[in-house]
Each structure stands twice: as C-alpha cells, then as structure tokens.
C-alpha cells in the first residue's frame, strides 16, 4: 500500500490532507464500557489515583485536569471500541483499568496470540494517526516502555468526543469536578465509532525512515497548530480493518 505525504500550502508551515477516509460508524459502545472508561479517566485526572503526563513528549503546553480527563476518556473509549470489534473473532484481553504512576499509564496494549496492539484515538473528523516523534526509535519501537515493539497500531475515531462536550459545558480547563455531576454529562450520549484502519510495525518503520513528519508549529489543514512533532499516517493510507489477520 502506498503512503502519501501531507501537502504543503502557500505557507511553509501549513499542511493539508491528501488521503482521507470518510467516517463510517461501526457500532455504539455499550454503557457498561463507557462507565468503566469514565471511572478510569476520572481517577487518572480529578481523582489523582494515577498520573497522566500534563504535556506531550515534544510539546510545551501543560494540560489542566479537565483536559487530561477528556483526553484519557477518549483514549479509553477507543480501546473499548477495538475490544468490542476484535473480541468477536479473537481471544483478546479487556482494556487495562489499573491506575499507574507517571510513565506507566501509556504502556497499554492488547495482546492477541503473542502480538501486541497499540490503539490511538482521534475525533470523528480526524484523518491522521499521530505518533510523537521523540517516543519512537528507528526500529518503530516505543522508547518510554523500554523500546517495546508493537506489531500493529490501530486508529479509532469517535463521535461526540469528550473534549467537545467538556468545552461546551465550560469544564475543559477545570481543576476539580464532582464525579457524579460530571457523569451526568456523558451517560446518555451515544458513543458511536469507526476504525479507519491500522498499520504494521513494518509500515511504521517505513514512515519513520521516509520522514513522514509534521513538526511542532505546523498548522494542520492550515488552522490546527501542532504542539509537538509527530510521525504520521493518513487515514486513507491505512490498511482496512477487514484485512487484519494473525
């Protein structure tokens, strides 16, 4: 499969999509999955049971607890999405809900038949798999987890994203929130998702070697400023979910 680079705009820092994939809902997450993801995200942010990095590896912006909650909630929802999709055909572990100290929380993976899967999330209108450049070596291994080798990396897109809801309710930059009151914002939301595709470790090594990079300070689609430098793969270039085999 060919990989396409982002197109440079009139401004050198403006980058535009060249290979997109329309959002196509696969399913709606069961409420019990949503509640588990919510509880985990709350404890890792407002609850302070664990610790999430307040900034990206190559970034400088320090996130507030409300932002950490929203980002963590989205990520865990998307892990449950992959779990619900793949459990139909594979023996797969449930998403990890343990709260760890700093540096351990993002060492999450699914394991199927000895193969490790990494899950990345984005909003429903997203078209990029983003991997922070400082976190990966030239072998496509994840440096913060002792150079862990992921065999597959999936991208999941979710509608009604937590960040959008938190922003609308003016809670995104909050320092503290009551758990029961916060849950009321999310319990009746329909959490539907799609999976635009996945890449293999060999694909990742190719992307790294050929410098598929969007830099800190670049503007995605000319408007979204990148806070960190990332390797990327466009959604339209990813292998479709139906091609996943072990």
Name each model feature, range by range.
Residues 1-108, 120-246:
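Nucleic-acid endonuclease domains
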Residues 110-114:
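Active-site beta-strand termini and strand-to-loop segments that position acidic
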Residues 116-118:
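Short hydrophobic-acidic sequence motifs that mark active-site Asp/Glu residues
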